[in-house]
Amino acid sequence: MSKIIFIHKKNNKQEYNKYSERILRAAPKTLCIDKVNREFIEESIDTADYLFINETRGEIRGFATVYHDNFDGKHIHISLICNSTTSNIITRKGVPTLGGKALIESILAYGKKIKVKDVRLDAIKEVIPYYYKLGFTFENSHYNKDKEEELIKQLRKAYLNNSNTEFKQILRKIVVKFYSGYFKEKFQHDMGKNDDERVVYAMDRGIPMKFVFKPQSICKGKSIKQPNKCAKHKTCKVVNGRKRSYCRKTKNTRKKYNI
């Protein structure tokens, strides 16, 4: 049977070390398919706060290293995710094994549980459309969602057509459109100053993407201790009762008695 194992390094150091050793024995060739060197895997494990492991009948099929990143707010960052290609097969007993998507979903579920603002990762160029399909978006894309979708479609088409020149041109458009200011702020010491150098850097390190959790509305008609928090939201209004104050949606015109 397949399952996703979650290990918090601070709370379970012994278990974390045990699985880390198992991952290092198998990861470079089997799990990461020779696409990630051993040094980077070791660094990702050492600096991570959590391990997410895809295990099938006692065998590790994939893993993800995740750490807390306090840059620009509270969020968690996936530093590395590897999953064996054999994870897509059906076992002899007819039980399908879990793939990389299950790892992502487990990480998102944990991020939502601990109430982070978003989950981030650096997507290598080949998988940008895949992560977009899972709900990850570019930085500053909320200003132009239509353009983001258009560029993603173009990027996927160029990749499927093996058009490397066109692929780089589209990637350059993405960097210029969504990441010019972002890269200047976060990586100004590591990368060049012009757009071409930023594209090379992005292709090497990956394009930063994030899955943003929608903030839960407080306009639920429940009593509140701090009315000012409700008043800050344009879609909310404060209703004062005899003993309590309530936060409602502005569209709610129904009178509430005995308050």
PLM segments and residue spans:
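Extracellular Cys-Trp
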Residues: Q216-Y257
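Non-catalytic substrate-recognition and accessory regions of acyl/acetyltransferase enzymes
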Residues: M1-L98, A102-P215
